[in-house]
Curated annotation (Swiss-Prot):
It catalyses: dUTP + H2O = dUMP + diphosphate + H(+). Pathway: Pyrimidine metabolism; dUMP biosynthesis; dUMP from dCTP (dUTP route): step 2/2. GO terms for biological process: dUMP biosynthetic process; dUTP catabolic process. It comes from the Bacteria. GO terms for molecular function: dUTP diphosphatase activity; magnesium ion binding. InterPro entries: dUTPase, dUTPase-like, dUTPase-like_sf, dUTPase_trimeric. This is Deoxyuridine 5'-triphosphate nucleotidohydrolase. This enzyme is involved in nucleotide metabolism: it produces dUMP, the immediate precursor of thymidine nucleotides and it decreases the intracellular concentration of dUTP so that uracil cannot be incorporated into DNA. Keywords: Hydrolase, Magnesium, Metal-binding, Nucleotide metabolism. It comes from Chlamydia caviae (strain ATCC VR-813 / DSM 19441 / 03DC25 / GPIC). The gene is dut. Its cofactor is Mg(2+). The keyword Cell wall biogenesis/degradation does not apply. Its EC number is 3.6.1.23.
Length: 147
């Protein structure tokens, strides 16, 4: 599969770090370092616009090392880049850590994962007819316990 990209001057294409990687690294396209205070959210540009084939999306996900070591997360994970979007890909990062984190120019800040999309047809049933019954029913939010 090919994703056509338009790059701002000095921006980098997404790049897979290893042969078996499912996520391609996205880099910060910034001129100066940006300090992210604990609890703060920032919007970081990548300098990339993508032409994603119809029937696919690009999911923006956190980098595990940034999350574990520094508490840096992609807030709306996974973020979705739709096939019909043509604007710059920007990453919403949040610092859930205890110290200020510095985003450096060209730093790998997130991963892009290409995934197929299925658009469903949504229909309505009246409440008398209802949904089909399951053993789970409407139980959620930890109903199976912690162990």
């Amino acid at each position: 599969m090919t994703i056509v990209c338009e790059l701002e001057s000095g921006a980098d294409l997404p790049e897979y770090a290893t042969e078996g990687a499912s996520g391609a690294d996205l880099r910060a396209h910034i001129e100066e370092p940006i300090a992210v205070l604990p609890g703060q959210r920032v919007l970081i540009p990548t300098g990339i616009k993508m032409q994603i084939p119809q029937g696919y999306e690009v999911q923006v996900r956190p980098r595990s090392g940034l999350a574990l070591k520094h508490g840096i997360m992609v807030v709306n994970s996974p973020g979705t880049i739709d096939a019909d979007y043509r604007g710059e890909v920007c990453i919403i990062l949040a610092n859930f850590g205890e110290s200020t984190f510095i985003i450096e120019p060209k730093m790998r800040i997130a991963q892009a994962v290409v995934a197929p999309v299925v658009q469903a047809k949504f229909i309505v049933v009246d409440q008398e007819e209802g949904l089909t019954a399951t053993s789970r029913g409407s139980r959620g939010f930890g109903h199976t316990g912690e162990k």
